[in-house]
Design a protein with these regions (language model features):
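Conserved sequence signature across two-component system core domains
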Residues: 10-11, 35, 53
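Active-site residues of response regulator receiver
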Residues: 56
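Generic leucine side-chain signal with a strong bias for well-ordered alpha-helical environments
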Residues: 8, 23-27, 45
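Non-catalytic signal-transmission and effector/linker regions of two-component phosphorelay proteins
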Residues: 1-6
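Short acidic/histidine-rich motifs immediately flanking catalytic phosphotransfer sites
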Residues: 48-52
Length: 61
C-alpha cells in the first residue's frame, strides 16, 4: 500500500480528527488533510489530489 497516498479526514469533532490522523501516522500515512464538515470536504475534494477519505457519517449540515 502506498504510504504517500493523500488522505482527507472529515469530522465535525476536532478531537476525533486528531485521533484518526495520529492513528494514520502510526501506520505510516503522514500525507493527510482535515475538513470540519461536509461542505469543506466537498470543496477540497473538487480541487482534487485525494486518494482516500475517512469520514464521519453523521455530521451537522
Amino acid at each position: 500500500m502506498n504510504k504517500n497516498m493523500r488522505i482527507l479526514v472529515v469530522d465535525d469533532f476536532s478531537t476525533m480528527r486528531r485521533i484518526v490522523k495520529n492513528l494514520l501516522a502510526d501506520l505510516g500515512f503522514t500525507n493527510t488533510a482535515e475538513a470540519e464538515d461536509g461542505g469543506a470536504a466537498f470543496t477540497m475534494l473538487k480541487q482534487g489530489g485525494f486518494d482516500f477519505v475517512v469520514t464521519d457519517w453523521n455530521m451537522p449540515g
